[in-house]
Amino acid sequence: MKDYYGKDISTLKNKKLFLFDMDGTINLGNELIPGMEGFFDKLKAAGREYYLLTNNSSRDHQHYVNKMNGLGVPVTRENVLISTDAFTNYMSKNHPDGKFYVLGTPQLEKNIADAGLTMTKTLEEGADFVVVGFDQTLTYEKLTTACRLIDKGVPYVATHPDVRCPIEGGEFIPDTGAMIELIKTATGKSPSMIFGKPFQY
């Protein structure tokens, strides 16, 4: 048996666990990609486990659980992994007392706070790391503070590298990678670490 690209996929029948990206693979925005209807029901019926992954750091797990179930994809909180998980797990283990200035949505900030990490809000408070996430609430003031901290020598990290986020109708909106490029242009510096797919953290 071969796939669309002519590659042998017969070995898939022996796999017990599958990992799937969400945005652009299972769905585009609030629309299921054609051909995905009933696919996960078949996986479950075959006794296979699966996890759904996303680099989108602007939301929390429950958002994706609700969204996927609403699209007919049966999933629980335990089956959803977001790039914020990689970031908070790493920082909780390696920099538990660090201070983080976050470019991100209120939900990303909540996810970070729920992990027990400390955030700062102003230039005067300083930071040990600037965190660049998928910030749909980005303002010039937040961007300026981030760049000034970075210019002062504060390293910055990113929750994921995606430049564009796919949405309904085959369109795209700017994602974290685009914000990284903006900061690189303004400061001349690259992130010290990037989390999320395809990176190892």
Ranges and model annotations:
Residues 1-22, 26-201:
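HAD-like aspartate-dependent phosphatase fold
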